[in-house]
């Protein structure tokens, strides 16, 4: 089995391995900047680590590839019999990360 980790960022958890591209909630920083993510669980072959003391020694490093926006979400508010319609759209800012190491 390959080495992978479950990391938490932006209130969500992601399964990552070295070389993966991951789309996460926006993280401040320029493209090319190194970012360290906090692991929640690490699997190395058949060895599973969830102990907080051991996870404090583990670092999941990644690099910011680009900043982009997610898909368009359309909001439509409507009130009956009054002719009230309100349309609005939203695109969530996201950051694409490339995982460079699990140590």
UniProtKB/Swiss-Prot annotation:
Function: This protein binds to 23S rRNA in the presence of protein L20.
InterPro entries, per the entry: bL21-like, bL21-like_sf, Ribosomal_bL21, Ribosomal_bL21_CS
Pfam families referenced in this protein's UniProt entry, alphabetically: Ribosomal_L21p
Family in the record: Belongs to the bacterial ribosomal protein bL21 family.
Keywords from the named record: Ribonucleoprotein, Ribosomal protein, RNA-binding, rRNA-binding
GO annotation terms (biological process): translation
Superkingdom in the source lineage: Bacteria
Annotated source species: Rhodococcus erythropolis (strain PR4 / NBRC 100887)
Name this polypeptide is given: Large ribosomal subunit protein bL21
GO molecular-function terms, A-Z: rRNA binding; structural constituent of ribosome
Assembly: Part of the 50S ribosomal subunit. Contacts protein L20.
GO cellular component, one term: cytoplasm
């Amino acid at each position: 089995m390959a080495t992978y980790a479950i990391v938490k960022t932006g209130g969500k958890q992601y399964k990552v391995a070295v070389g993966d591209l991951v789309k996460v909630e926006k993280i401040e920083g320029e493209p090319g900047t190194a970012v360290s993510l906090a692991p929640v669980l690490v699997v190395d072959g058949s060895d599973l680590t969830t102990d907080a003391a051991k996870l404090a020694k583990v670092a999941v490093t990644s690099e910011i590839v680009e900043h982009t926006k997610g898909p368009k979400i359309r909001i439509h508010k409507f009130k009956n019999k009054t002719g009230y319609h309100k349309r609005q759209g939203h695109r969530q800012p996201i950051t694409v990360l490339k995982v460079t190491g699990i140590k």
